[in-house]
């Protein structure tokens, strides 16, 4: 079985690990409630998406294809 010829140094190991990081979610402001929400999703508080009411009391008001 193959083994590494040299030990991986601290700097090389840390440079490789810099890519394992979390990204901030893309938040946008809802026009109806002025709350932050995830982009391309229905606002949980108001039920609006792209200025149209889609949810009311957690029930689907209008289906969008």
UniProtKB/Swiss-Prot annotation:
GO terms for cellular component: large ribosomal subunit. Signal peptide: none annotated. This is Large ribosomal subunit protein bL32. PANTHER family: 50S RIBOSOMAL PROTEIN L32, LARGE RIBOSOMAL SUBUNIT PROTEIN BL32. SUPFAM superfamilies: Zn-binding ribosomal proteins. The keyword Ribonucleoprotein applies. Keywords: Ribonucleoprotein, Ribosomal protein. It comes from Phytoplasma australiense. GO terms for biological process: translation. InterPro entries: Ribosomal_bL32, Ribosomal_bL32_bact, Ribosomal_zn-bd. One of its GO terms (molecular function) is structural constituent of ribosome. Belongs to the bacterial ribosomal protein bL32 family.
């Amino acid at each position: 079985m193959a083994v590494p010829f040299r030990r991986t140094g601290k700097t090389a190991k840390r440079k490789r690990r810099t890519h394992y990081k979390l990204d901030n979610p893309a938040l946008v402001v809802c026009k109806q409630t002025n709350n932050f929400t995830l982009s391309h999703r229905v606002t949980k508080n108001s039920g609006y998406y792209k200025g149209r009411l889609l949810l009311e009391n957690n029930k689907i008001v209008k289906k969008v294809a």
